[in-house]
């Protein structure tokens, strides 16, 4: 493990950025107390800003310590396809026609179940939607599930305890629910092509296990809070979802499918996105405000993580090489909590000669730990951004999120490791 000054300083900056993500509530408190600099403290309290801010610090260091050419070459050498993809797919999937389509699906399935409708809606939102993420991508599923939870439950004054328990299950289920296909989950997307993982492989190795875990997590949470859920006044919105014509919904779904199909080709999916913006403008009466700001913040978060993560290979790769498959599974869960799981699996894919058992352990560990922190899984900032306004002082406690994600993570461990 040979490290030069750039490696060491970059890792120090990365550690500071991670600590910053756990301190955003402190900055929000300062913002509420400050009269003259509340805007600045609010900025530092935005978890989506953290990695972009410290990526700027790293860039300034590279410029000062090396030179302009070195800093620019480093930035241009990184791959920003995933941040751009997440931004685009978030905006499209959160558009009103697609949201109405998925909401209508949830309502229909919930109504078909022979139980209280509010309870079944809660259960289906936390089970079906995360599994749907295997087909519409995890960022899209996170956006839809978070919007549904906010509208149907978080905005109805549920307890803080239920809020944290729900977001803990949501983050874990989204992370593991996208493993039925090789393109939906960012940590799998990073390795599927190189390791030749196709749809069949994903179903056989990951899909059935993740389905069991997702359903168990959603079921246990629903049973735990069923009394509180039943007290929520649930409004039937099945007619609301039919406002947009089927043709408009179909075109939105085609745009989403096109973006997913060309997920590796930035020029194409950005072009499709521009056409999508034009279409929503032409048929504005069927649209609501697009989720541009929130999506940009999430994309900025991920881009900053890419810049900072690119300098962590010097310690992460030798660490992975020193572990056996059993240790790497639990090690990946732990490392995922402090690093993006897609970055972790990508670095693992750079190591040659890995056994199939090692590959499974690395990816399974990465998705298992994807709900423990906001930075653990690429779609998490999307859910955080949508739901944080419902929490006290507009911030989500990283510690309480971590604690509430542990039970669901343990269920995922049982399914991925022992089934």
What are the language-model segments listed below?
Residues 1-8, 40-47, 68-83, 199-209, ...:
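Interfacial loop-to-helix junctions that mark the boundaries of transmembrane helices
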Residues 2, 6-33, 164, 168, ...:
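Juxtamembrane and boundary regions of transmembrane helices in multi-pass small-molecule transporters
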Residues 36-38, 224-248, 284-292:
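Flexible interhelical linker loops that connect adjacent transmembrane helices
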Residues 59-74, 89-108, 131-143, 310-318:
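Transmembrane alpha-helix boundary signature
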Residues 90-96, 116-117, 128-140, 172-181, ...:
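Helix-loop-helix module between adjacent transmembrane segments
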């Amino acid at each position: 493990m040979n490290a030069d000054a750039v490696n060491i300083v970059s890792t120090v900056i990365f550690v500071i950025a991670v600590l910053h993500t756990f301190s955003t509530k402190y900055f929000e408190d300062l913002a509420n107390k400050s009269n003259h600099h509340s805007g600045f403290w609010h900025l530092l309290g935005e978890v989506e800003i953290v990695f972009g801010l410290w990526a700027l610090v790293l860039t300034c260091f590279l410029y000062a310590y090396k030179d302009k050419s070195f800093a620019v070459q480093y930035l241009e050498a990184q791959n920003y396809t995933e941040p751009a993809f997440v931004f685009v797919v978030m905006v499209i999937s959160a558009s009103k026609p697609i949201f109405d389509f998925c909401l209508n699906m949830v309502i229909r399935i919930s109504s078909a179940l022979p139980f209280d409708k509010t309870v079944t809606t809660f259960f289906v939102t936390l089970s079906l939607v995360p599994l749907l993420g295997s087909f519409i991508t995890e960022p899209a599923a996170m956006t839809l599930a978070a919007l549904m939870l906010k509208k149907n439950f978080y905005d109805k004054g549920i307890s803080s305890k239920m809020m944290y328990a729900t977001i803990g299950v949501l983050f874990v289920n989204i992370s593991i629910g996208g493993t039925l296909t090789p393109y939906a989950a960012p940590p799998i997307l990073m390795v599927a092509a190189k390791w030749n993982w196709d749809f069949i492989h994903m179903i056989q190795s990951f899909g059935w296990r993740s389905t069991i875990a997702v359903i168990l997590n959603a079921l246990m949470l629903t049973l735990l809070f069923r009394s509180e859920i039943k007290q929520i006044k649930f409004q039937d919105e099945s007619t609301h979802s039919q406002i947009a014509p089927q043709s408009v919904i179909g075109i939105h779904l085609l745009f989403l499918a096109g973006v997913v199909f060309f997920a590796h080709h930035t020029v194409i999916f950005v072009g499709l996105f521009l056409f999508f913006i034009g279409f929503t403008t032409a048929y504005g009466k069927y649209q609501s405000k697009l989720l541009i700001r929130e999506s940009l913040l999430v994309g900025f978060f991920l881009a900053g993580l890419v810049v900072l993560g690119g300098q962590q290979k010097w310690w992460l790769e030798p660490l992975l090489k020193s572990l056996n498959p059993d240790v790497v599974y639990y090690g990946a869960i732990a490392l995922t909590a402090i690093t993006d799981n897609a970055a972790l699996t990508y670095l693992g894919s750079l190591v040659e000669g890995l056994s199939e058992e090692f590959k499974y352990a690395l990816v399974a560990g990465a998705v298992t730990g994807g709900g423990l922190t906001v930075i653990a899984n690429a779609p998490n900032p999307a859910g955080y951004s949508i739901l944080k306004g419902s929490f006290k002082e507009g911030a989500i406690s990283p510690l309480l999120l971590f604690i509430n994600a542990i039970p669901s993570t343990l269920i995922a461990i049982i399914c991925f490791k022992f089934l």
